[in-house]
């Protein structure tokens, strides 16, 4: 937020782009008008209208007194789904077989985007783009790799 304010104070009027730490509400309260029109990438947006996201949001709100799930909730859910899928494919919870099944995860439908693990076990999935518009975070699009 402070970098955005400084950029605006220096006369920079270009759109600014940040990472997933920008989703903190303090960005809006501290940055004010300086963050208007900025963008950031993250893992998830409850505004995404994909069936996986809308179903997750509905179930979460029903379970947690109408609270809207944040990115950490979505990532935690997806991690549990990767594990459940790997257990099912491995047919066991034996550690070596489970490790291999997790490593073999490919295009698993997920709330944060279809998940594929590469040879180094890094997740490859969509990046979600959010814009700050009228003082609010707004979903723009999910960009698949």
Task: Identify the role of each PLM range.
Residues 1-145:
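Extracytosolic ligand-binding ectodomains
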């Amino acid at each position: 937020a402070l970098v955005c304010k400084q950029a605006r104070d220096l006369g920079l009027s270009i759109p600014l782009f940040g990472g997933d730490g920008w989703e903190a509400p303090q960005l809006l309260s501290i940055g004010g008008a300086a963050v208007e029109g900025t963008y950031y990438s993250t893992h998830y947006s409850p505004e995404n209208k994909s069936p996986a996201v809308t179903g997750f949001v509905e179930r979460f709100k029903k379970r947690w007194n109408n609270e809207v799930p944040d990115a950490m909730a979505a990532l935690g859910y997806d991690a549990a789904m990767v594990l459940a899928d790997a257990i099912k494919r491995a047919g066991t919870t034996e550690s070596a077989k489970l490790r291999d099944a997790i490593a073999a995860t490919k295009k698993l439908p997920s709330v944060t985007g279809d998940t594929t693990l590469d040879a180094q076990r890094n997740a490859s999935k969509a990046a979600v783009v959010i814009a700050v518009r009228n003082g609010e975070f707004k979903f723009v699009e999910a960009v698949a790799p």
